[in-house]
Regions:
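Short, surface-exposed secondary-structure edge patches
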Residues: 1-3, 26-27
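Generic alpha-helical secondary structure signal
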Residues: 8, 21, 40-42
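Short, acidic/polar N-cap/turn motifs at the starts of alpha helices
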Residues: 7-9, 35
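Short glycine-/polar-rich loops that comprise or flank the Walker A/P-loop
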Residues: 14-15, 34
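Charge/polar-rich, low-complexity and marginally structured segments
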Residues: 57-168
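Short beta-strand-centered aromatic/proline hotspots
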Residues: 15-25
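Short, well-ordered loop/turn sites that connect or cap secondary structure elements
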Residues: 3-4, 11
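Short solvent-exposed strand/turn elements
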Residues: 27-57
Length: 168
């Protein structure tokens, strides 16, 4: 997972970033450590100076990954369009843990379970679950829109309409 280079776009469970430098720094013991530096792609004026770095050897632990591929987008929508596996159970405590894995494909069952739970519970759908679901859809919409060069709004609508079709 060390195949990151300057100019690459990367993502964590919240934002899309761009790597702008690779430098060697010293760790706390004075040993040289190769790090890459990145900043949010869409930083506000206040946050334009915000930068982050991560040792290249720790990228796997950082939660950062390359953006989903175009083939990954196709697989995502294909899985999203399939009916929900009836053996899956909605487990709210595991939802956030699974999201921190930052894997769009592994997010599909969680998203489908949240959506199904929303349909089944109607007005009683927990506000926290609603917020989590919207956060997932927003994050995926941002990433997929960036990769496919489509609008956020069209991807957001496509995700929601696919969820509706697969749950009927």
């Amino acid at each position: 997972m060390t195949d990151f280079k300057v100019g690459d776009h990367i993502v964590d469970f919240e934002n899309i970033y761009q790597i702008y430098a690779v430098k060697t720094q010293k760790d706390l013991k004075g040993a040289p450590v190769k790090c890459f530096f990145y900043r949010p792609l869409e930083a506000s004026e206040r946050d334009k100076s915000v930068v982050a770095s991560v040792p290249i050897d720790n990228v796997a632990k950082s939660g950062l990954r390359h953006l989903i591929s175009k083939d990954g987008v196709k697989e995502f929508f294909k899985l999203l369009g399939k009916p929900l596996d009836t053996a899956l159970l909605f487990e709210p405590k595991l939802t956030k843990e699974a999201l921190y894995l930052n894997d769009p494909i592994k997010t599909v069952p969680i998203l489908k379970l949240l959506f199904q739970n929303k349909i089944q519970t109607a007005e009683k759908f927990a506000k926290t679950n609603s917020e989590v679901m919207e956060r997932i859809v927003k994050h995926l919409s941002d990433e997929i829109a960036f990769v496919t060069k489509k609008s956020f709004k069209s991807i957001h609508s496509q995700i929601l309409s696919t969820l509706k079709k697969s749950s009927t």
